[in-house]
């Protein structure tokens, strides 16, 4: 009948339209996201803790959810030792309890470690050039790349913001590239005491700076 024919045509039209659904924004991966790789690696668990306590600014969501989503992210992930070293330095406390980390510090660590290339490719190390990376970090700063050479092996060494050496490069995920670093990434504009705190051979000096007023004096000199 005419009515049955119309129902058939409407049904066909509905399913035809359903086939045209844009899947570009559906958060489904065939492989793993950057967040998955970080979560599964015990040596990156401190950074994952930071992700869970850093707000993405989207309705209170945290950064671990951002790195589960589609995108083109370059992430410089510090090891547990790197995170512990940084916390010990800025709080002048050996073996600082990571659970006591203020959310603001977690956000600072995380935002300085992530570059969102939006619709462009995330960065492999083969695309790095000496100098400033084109896209800003989520902390709204330009990270820098410098190259060095291992004196023993002759292998190229890559440093982010001068002090954070990439120790495991080009770990590919569905939503970008992950590079493991041996220091928390902090920009050049960090205070001089904070930069000193990042160096193993200056730990005693760093402790003295943070336990005396010399830290403030150095900051005042830098600000002038």
Give, region by region, the residue ranges found by the protein language model.
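Sec-dependent bacterial lipoprotein signal peptides
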Residues: 1-17
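Mature, structured domains of secreted/extracytosolic soluble proteins
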Residues: 15-224
């Amino acid at each position: 009948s005419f009515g049955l024919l119309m129902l058939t045509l409407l049904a066909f039209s509905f399913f035809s339209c359903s086939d045209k659904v844009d899947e570009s924004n559906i958060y489904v991966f065939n492989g793993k996201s950057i967040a998955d790789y970080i979560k599964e690696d015990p040596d990156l668990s401190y950074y994952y803790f930071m992700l869970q306590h850093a707000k993405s600014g989207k309705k209170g969501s945290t950064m671990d959810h951002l790195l589960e989503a589609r995108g083109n992210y370059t992430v410089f992930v510090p090891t547990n030792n790197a995170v512990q070293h940084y916390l010990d330095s800025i709080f002048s406390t050996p073996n600082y309890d990571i659970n006591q980390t203020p959310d603001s510090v977690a956000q600072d660590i995380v935002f300085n470690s992530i570059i969102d290339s939006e619709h462009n490719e995330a960065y492999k190390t083969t695309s790095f050039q000496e100098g400033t990376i084109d896209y800003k970090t989520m902390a709204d700063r330009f990270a820098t790349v410098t190259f060095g050479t291992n004196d023993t092996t002759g292998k190229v060494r890559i440093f982010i913001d001068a002090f954070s050496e990439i120790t495991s490069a080009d770990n590919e995920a569905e939503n970008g590239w992950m590079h493991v670093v041996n220091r928390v990434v902090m920009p050049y504009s960090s205070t001089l005491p904070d930069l000193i705190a990042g160096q193993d051979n200056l730990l005693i000096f760093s402790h003295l700076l943070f336990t005396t007023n010399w830290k403030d004096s150095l900051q005042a000199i830098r600000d002038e």
